[in-house]
Structure formats: structure tokens, C-alpha cells
Amino acid sequence: MIKGFRCKETEKLFLRRRSSRFPAGVHRIALRKLLLLDAAEKLEDLRIPPGNRLEKLAGNRQGQHSIRINDQWRICFRWSESDAYEVEIVDYH
């Protein structure tokens, strides 16, 4: 379950409000992935579908994980027990 957002624009999207920060083509897929993240009971639940490409991040994002929205955009978050924290949508390019 999502317990907190790092980005207000990501939270707006999760609440089904439009955000000008993200391209229109990203909204629908991002919302679907945010709903998957919210429904996950354990981190491994996010391995399905394989297109999520669940990754453990390193460097300045150590301690975070990500799932893909598309080749450019990711949802980054911290996972603890059965909850996601500091959820944000990030442009990886």
C-alpha cells in the first residue's frame, strides 16, 4: 500500500487528477502502475507483469526501488514491510 508521496504531482495523478508535469501519454499507464503499487502486499508482487522491470536502485537512490512506466519514466519508491513510501514519478533521461 502507498503510505506517502515524495512528489505532490505524483499524488495528484494517483488521486485521478491531471498533472501538467507529466506528458498526457504517461498519465494512463502511470496511474495503472501506481494502482499496482498500492495493491502490492510484498515487493515481489511488483515483478508481475514482467514489463514493470522491478529494480533495486543504487548510487544516490540507494534504498529505493523502481518500476517502469515506459523507456523514459519510472516510479521510484522506498519499500518497508508491506508498504511503499516516498513514491515519485521520475524522468530517467
Where do the model's predicted regions map?
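Glycine-rich, flexible loop/turn motifs
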Residues: 1, 9, 18, 42, ...
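Arg/Lys-rich, positively charged N-terminal/basic patches that mediate binding to nucleic acids
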Residues: 1-33
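Generic structural signal for well-ordered secondary structure
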Residues: 3, 27-30, 46-50, 68-70
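Amphipathic alpha-helical interface surfaces
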Residues: 6, 30-33, 53, 57, ...
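Conserved phosphate-interacting/catalytic interface
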Residues: 37
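A short, surface-exposed loop/turn module that caps and links secondary-structure elements
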Residues: 41-65
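Enriched for short, Lys/Arg-rich terminal
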Residues: 58, 65-93
